[in-house]
């Protein structure tokens, strides 16, 4: 599935034109995750659909969702901008930036310098880079370009091998472990438990995907995660603020 998505993305890049630049005060993703009021930092995601789960919500209001996430204690907002597979939109980034005071992470399949430029133009504070989508050297080049544009990066790995290749080139400031197996699309927080021991102490660690219960959060916290990225579990709930409260139940997490 990843290869199919990347092939589509390369076709989109060939036709990409930079939008007019949006100007917003920059907010640090890393700093915001470090000063959370919750047991772990929370990147709450706005996602209408996904290839593995289909449509999560028939209609969405990114601004309304972002506002509720902020009220619930989120440290940052992740915004899906891929149209073809996730029904996202780059316009959502500016809409959310205008609504909340939190940093906004652009979640997409970033493969080229032009997309980094686009990310800076649309007003994001940070962007996702996926280790499984490119060689570590190419990822490092995009990472350096992003930081030169005032953007932070969440660098995502799916395996010990990907992390090992990445660390041979450089150590990202924020590393994400995706709990989804890209071959089967099944999720398990055991992925974070297995890979976290390889993450350098100086990097901030985010556990992504497949987090559905307070026990899942307790497990990744024990494994060394500093933050979690949660999308589907929140998007499926009518009361998203209560969903955050339920997931981050102190008594359950600190058992």
From Swiss-Prot:
Q: Which GO terms describe its molecular function?
A: indole-3-glycerol-phosphate synthase activity; phosphoribosylanthranilate isomerase activity
One BP annotation, GO: L-tryptophan biosynthetic process
Q: Tell me one Pfam family matched here.
A: IGPS
Uppermost EC category: lyase
Output the CDD domains linked to this UniProt entry: IGPS
* Superkingdom in the source lineage: Bacteria
- Catalytic activity annotated for this protein? 1-(2-carboxyphenylamino)-1-deoxy-D-ribulose 5-phosphate + H(+) = (1S,2R)-1-C-(indol-3-yl)glycerol 3-phosphate + CO2 + H2O
> Which pathway does the record list?
Amino-acid biosynthesis; L-tryptophan biosynthesis; L-tryptophan from chorismate: step 4/5
Cited InterPro entries? Aldolase_TIM (IPR013785), Indole-3-glycerol_P_synth (IPR045186), Indole-3-glycerol_P_synth_dom (IPR013798), Indole-3-GlycerolPSynthase_CS (IPR001468), RibuloseP-bd_barrel (IPR011060)
Q: What is its EC number?
A: 4.1.1.48
Q: What HAMAP family does the entry give?
A: IGPS_B
Name the family: Belongs to the TrpC family.
Instruction: State the NCBIfam families in the record.
Output: PRK00278.2-2, PRK00278.2-4
Protein's name according to its UniProt entry: Indole-3-glycerol phosphate synthase
Native source species: Shouchella clausii (strain KSM-K16) (Alkalihalobacillus clausii)
Q: Which gene encodes it?
A: trpC
